[in-house]
Amino acid sequence: MSKKVQAKQGTDDLVMLPKVSEDEICENLKKRYMNDFIYTNIGPVLISVNPFRNLNNSGPDFIEAYRGKHAQEVPPHVYQLAESAYRAMKNDQENQCVIISGESGAGKTEAAKLIMGYVSAISGSTEKVEYVKHVILESNPLLEAFGNAKTLRNNNSSRFGKYFEIQFDKAGDPVGGKIYNYLLEKSRVVYQNPGERNFHIFYQLLAGASAQEKRDYVLSSPESYYYLNQSQCYTVDGINDVSDYAEVRQAMDTIGLTAQEQSDIIRIVACVLHIGNIYFIEDDKGNAAIYDPNALELAASMLCIDSATLQNAILFRVINTGGAGGAGNRRSTYNVPQNVEQANGTRDALARTIYDRMFSWLVERVNQSLSYYKSPYQNVIGILDIFGFEIFEKNGFEQFCINFVNEKLQQFFIELTLKAEQEEYVREGIKWEPIKYFNNQIVCDLIEGKSPPGIFSLLDDICSTLHAQSTGTDQKFLEKMAGIYDGHLHWRGMTGAFAIKHYAGEVTYEAEGFSDKNKDTLFFDLIEAIQCSKMPFLASLFNEDTGSLQKKRPTTAGFKIKTSAGELMKALSQCTPHYIRCIKPNETKKAKDWENSRVKHQVQYLGLLENVRVRRAGFAYRNTFDKVLKRYKKLSSKTWGIWGEWKGDAIEGCKTIFQDMNLEAGQWQLGKTKVFIRHPETVFLLEEALDKKDFDCTAKIQKAFRNWKAKKHSLEQRAQIAHMFKDKKERQRNSIDRKFTSDYIDFENQFGLQEAMQNAHKKERVVFADTVIKIDRRAKQKNYEMVLTDQALYFVEKSIKKKVLVHTLIRRVGLREIKGVSISTLSDNVIVFHLPEHDQVIENDKKTEIIIVLVEYFKAIGGGSLNVQFSDRINYTLKKGEQKEISFQKSEQCPTLVVKKGGKGLIGTIASGLPSSTDSTPKNYNPNSMSQASSRPAPQQSAGRGRGMPQGAGQPQPQQPQQQQRPMPQPQQGGGARPMPQPQQGGGARPMGAPQQGGAPQQGAGRQLPQPTQQGGAPGGRGAPMGRGAPGGGPAGAGGRPLPTVAKPAPQPSRPTAKALYDYDASSTDELSFKEGDIIFIVQKDNGGWTQGELKSGQKGWAPTNYLQYN
């Protein structure tokens, strides 16, 4: 980025700021925010500023732009961090987690959804994987509907904490997951501050329910329900409750909820609303009474319980006194009436608990769907989306718990990014300048400590000792805190409240309600009333044994949140963390509105300045010696030998790699147990080199496979045309063993030809190209370029015009328009194409290849079987429909075709060829085998690890001790492969096995001897055996060895033997396949590096000598 652009848009990594201060950080974030660059890095930490509008900077196109890219290659983005986490999980095979922090409304939930979307998009697509992806993505709208709400600071505020673990298999595909939910804000069910809403699902149901649902659940407008009308806020800008309800129902289907389960959930949501409409008045005794019996009846009917049972559970509290029924003890039960305030509290407790338990069931149901296939998993990526730090005008127990969890997360961040990093430098002996920072451990101890007791412990003690009291407990709690914490730097007492100086600022908490909310108990008579419900789903949510519960000390809300926070920290500590620090730029929730004081406050309490200083002074990457060696050992030939192992010390291995990569000494340091790399660009360099290494190796393997596949296909084509021509056409000797090459005119570089064809090759695949001889009606001949693609047949004329070579397209015929082809039964090379309008007569010595390729692609395009006629009198059509005939005759005086006018058109004369009964099927063609290898030239070996393998030699080999290196035959002076002995004078080489019947033996193809790589070792990269004549072949050329004249007799037990040092898979029918350790009887040896041997099974063949150890 240029200085001019940076001055306008800001730098995308705060580590690169020229000056480092909180003001400079804020100014840089503002520049980027105003230019719609909402993401900024601090090294690996991502800062995200909520734009409060859609910037269209996510989705499939952006995902593709970040897929597989290193962080230094692409601009900051949530996708960048997600790619880093996913890559680290796959490469290091270690659990990862993404911790998203920031205050309410800063954009944490959206960041979490982007991560889940990215991981789903870049992973595999099997049926099971796609199912898990859908559940992961559809769980978001479902849980948001039941767990999110509009608050004063955020229109879609998460009112619960969620830690989502996505489980991956070894291939990096999601195969399952698990959601952990924390601290649902139950109090919102029954009360909301002015300008806020209850959970989204209530408004979605009332707006989007069908007419039938509204009748079944007796639904009306939000204004009709006490639990919704207290805040006078029913709609939200940018939220469509009708469409959101449809999305929720779709998500329920995707998750796999049955129709009955969906109906039960919607019924419970309606139940909560109807419970809230039960109002109370005071009777003449001062006790609570039902104001409207119809409201009670409606709520009871929705709960599927008797109205009298519900009424008694709300208006009376059952109190048991006395012993447990033993001798001398009497147990008494009393129904104590409640006043209006107590009845309201009981009603609200019932509604809160029903909704809370239904939400917990929903989370567990999503987990069941995620583990539907019960697939084993290798690693996880955890995504933490939890409520942000909250400071309101009036803060209570809920804010205290929320802020405690955020305090723990801040401590976790400090421990891993500031404190632990600096301590590690000292521990490893790395030169380092300490950076000062605020450690909030003191605040965490204040809240959860044991000695001295923390605030949660004091609150639990108050609730335990004063459990029977309902008044005065909050004041006792304040007094007890004052006695212990008076003078504490981060606690301050005041009338009816106390203040804590958190990392994000001082928050004042109203003590009223702390004790009751911490008890978090539901009266047992209420539980027993719900257990009477005739709705099985509702009753299952309250399946506890109330009798045994009464004997236990109840668990407090404070204890639960402390335990949950501890478990969360433990889960996070088992992962490699990645951080997203979300910033809310304003309170108006408007785009382009920047409140500098608010942003600066967040920059301060998030510790961004200290984070920048640590990153500038520290090292971008560190890892243990063995992991660095394992990751980068391919980058040095010394650490990446033929077996891929390094026998030396891990420290020396790391040094070797860095030195061979020419890394400057100042870019890296070696600690006591780890390697430290200073700049991310250096890591990027290593990763890029690693990718290139892998790409090069992959490309070689792919090329070898493509070559093998092409040659196999060529063999199949030759076998097919041999079958087609057998007993129908005489053959020319030089065409019997001719290999198919497809392109004989270097089409890729014939730009004039391509242009004449209107660049058809960009849309069509060229499958044959050559120069042909066009024969016209007067027997005149002219050269054309003929190109056959998978779609059409092209004829192009070349001519010189004004000293310039010009290509002119004569005609293009679609393959499906071809009516057929005709050829004679003699040995000529004439082909007559029967085409629309007029036919085309050509001569070309690759006629067999042309016809078989045309037959193949004619069928592939849907034309069926091409009509191929054999006749010595062929009728063909000229322009304007004139009919002509070309006839063929033999004359031994015409070794090449002679065409003259005569008869009804043209007469072609040619000498006799090989008999039509000649079988031209390739000798090494086996229709039942994939190994058609002996006709293939052996691939060349590459430097480094061996490539270029014969058929069957490419499988991974077991590791061998270095002392068992395979001996490599030494080349003779003069370089190159060692030449084989020349054939004996006076005739061809001896045939393999029994003498071949008939005439002179045919020329054989040489084969290259398997060679170990220069490092020695495994045959994993061996080539094919060198320079030996093919089976049944004639004289070997230069480098060939003399073949035996007759087959040798069966081996006798007294003959010498050899032991196989390595596995070998034969690449032709005359070679011998064997396994390491096999005993081979020696038949004969030659000087060309081959030994003829026989296994105990009687199988005989040739084996490379350097694979054997003679006994």
UniProtKB/Swiss-Prot annotation:
CDD domains in alphabetical order: MYSc_Myo1, SH3
Domain named TH1: residues: 729-913
Compositionally biased intervals (Polar residues): 914-928
Top-level taxonomic group: Eukaryota
Gene3D superfamilies to which the protein is assigned, alphabetical: 1.10.10.820, 1.20.5.4820, 1.20.58.530, Kinesin motor domain, Myosin VI head, motor domain, U50 subdomain, SH3 Domains
Disruption phenotype: Shows defects in pseudopod formation and translocation. Also shows slower speed of locomoting, aggregation-stage cells and significant reduction in initial rate of phagocytosis. MyoB and myoC double mutant exhibits profound defects in growth, endocytosis and rearrangement of F-actin. Expression of the full-length myoB heavy chain in these cells fully rescues the double mutant defects. myoB and myoD double mutant exhibits reduction in the speed of whole cell translocation. myoB, myoC and myoD triple mutant exhibits reduction in the speed of whole cell translocation.
GO molecular function, one term: myosin light chain binding
Residues that, per the record, bind ATP: G102, E103, S104, G105, A106, G107, K108, T109
Phosphoserine sites (modified residues): S332
Region Disordered, residue ranges: 910-1058
The entry's keywords: Actin-binding, ATP-binding, Cell projection, Chemotaxis, Cytoplasm, Motor protein, Myosin, Nucleotide-binding, Phosphoprotein, SH3 domain
Family: Belongs to the TRAFAC class myosin-kinesin ATPase superfamily. Myosin family.
Quaternary structure, from the entry: Myosin I heavy chain is single-headed. Dimer of a heavy and a light chain. Inability to self-assemble into filaments.
Function: Myosin is a protein that binds to actin and has ATPase activity that is activated by actin. Myosin IB may have a role in chemotaxis and aggregation; it could serve to stabilize and even retract cortical structures, such as pseudopods and lamellopods. Involved in the whole cell motility of aggregation-stages cells. Overexpression results in significant decrease in the rate of cellular translocation and fluid-phase pinocytosis and abnormalities in the normal rearrangement of the actin cytoskeleton.
Name assigned to this protein: Myosin IB heavy chain
